[in-house]
Amino acid sequence: MLDILLLRKDLASAVARLETRKKPQAFLNVEAFQALESERKTIQMRTEELQSQRNQLSKQIGMLMGKGEKDAAEAAKAQVAAIKAELDGSATRLDQIQGELQSMLAAVPNLPHESVPVGSDESANVEVRRWSPDGPQPRSLGFTPKDHVDLGEPLGLDFDMGVKLSGSRFTVMKGGIARLHRALAQFMLDVQTQEHGYTECYVPYVVNADSLKGTGQLPKFEGDLFAAQKGGQDAEPVPDNAQLYLIPTSEVPLTNFVRDEVLAEAQLPLKLTAHTPCFRSEAGSYGRDTRGMIRQHQFDKVEMVQIVHPDKSYEALEEMTRHAEAVLQKLGLPYRVMSLCTGDMGFGAAKTYDLEVWLPAQNTYREISSVSNCEAFQARRLQARFKNAQGKNELVHTLNGSGLAVGRTLVAVLENYQNEDGSVTIPEVLRPYMGGQATLPV
């Protein structure tokens, strides 16, 4: 959530920065905001005036009673009672206004950082760098590559069974390919915990509405979530804040560790990681990536989260991007790093880098990780703070990133390590997790 003081100080500048984001969405009803702000100021000025009058009358009452002027004192008491009634009404209306302003701000995305390229969609994203084990460009396989579906089905990918069990955009894995998927997740966790200093966490896969509000998925993106309905004899209607949802990413529970907390400055940075399934309805993606594992309702991901001092968040963004890159480099997978433009960034991000891995069968790069600095946007919603050197509570900055998406990494391994006979060579770094196995045979 944006700092309302920033909007009060320079609304025009904030709106101009918001206008660079994805259109035609209206992020802030400026007229409604200004009307509420005007009413708030009027009420606050009137409140201060009434409080001053009440204080003066209270003093007069004591003086009048001391002089024995009982009738005048009673008249002053009546005035105080009338002022109290008006103050109570003003306080109620002020609470309503503050609630309306908070609801309005909850739908407004983060302001893009000044270093973010301006553009309306992904065509304006800027390539930062690329890497390949064989030079700047991905190597040719020397034969016409198969995509991961044609490769994977003989090896244990079963899309028909996924449809049978759950519907479209679900996948079943069996045998060696299921083990390779598990090996990738274990390898990613080991890299992030043993080499990059993250603390591994096991988290619930179901969270409450307050957790999703804190990280920005609610209320704006409820349509992208899977709600969980509690069953059994105690399945009673629940209030909105007690509604449960399947996690769309472990960013949600990990970042909420610090909700309503005040950390010591010495505790920063907090570096957390978790391997979880993620559940997304993929609303609005009808007809996109319907073949294979690229866009699923359920997929696994190793997530990285950092909670940092505000002065360190852009250093942390670069560091986390390198942490995600390290996994791809160890796997020998060609990739490029893209700086997302203002129109392509997520709701809570001030700046985002996407890592895109090379897929030979598509002859293109596809997103495999997204690393974002949310600055204080989530922390303000979460009331996540630390005690600074001056002893004052200050909002932390939060960052999150994939380290990596496991299913898409499996896709990249299958396509980049395929052999002409349809078998797949297992990357050397994964072989210890595969019992020394070097190949997935057809």
Swiss-Prot record:
Q: What class of enzyme is it?
A: ligase
Q: Which amino acid positions bind ATP, per UniProt?
A: 280-282, 367-370
Decide whether keyword Aminoacyl-tRNA synthetase is in the record. yes
The UniProt keywords, alphabetically, are: Aminoacyl-tRNA synthetase, ATP-binding, Cytoplasm, Ligase, Nucleotide-binding, Protein biosynthesis
Q: Does the keyword Aminoacyl-tRNA synthetase apply?
A: yes
Q: Which Pfam families match?
A: Seryl_tRNA_N, tRNA-synt_2b
Q: Which domain of life is it from?
A: Bacteria
Subunit record text = Homodimer. The tRNA molecule binds across the dimer.
UniProt name for this protein:
Serine--tRNA ligase
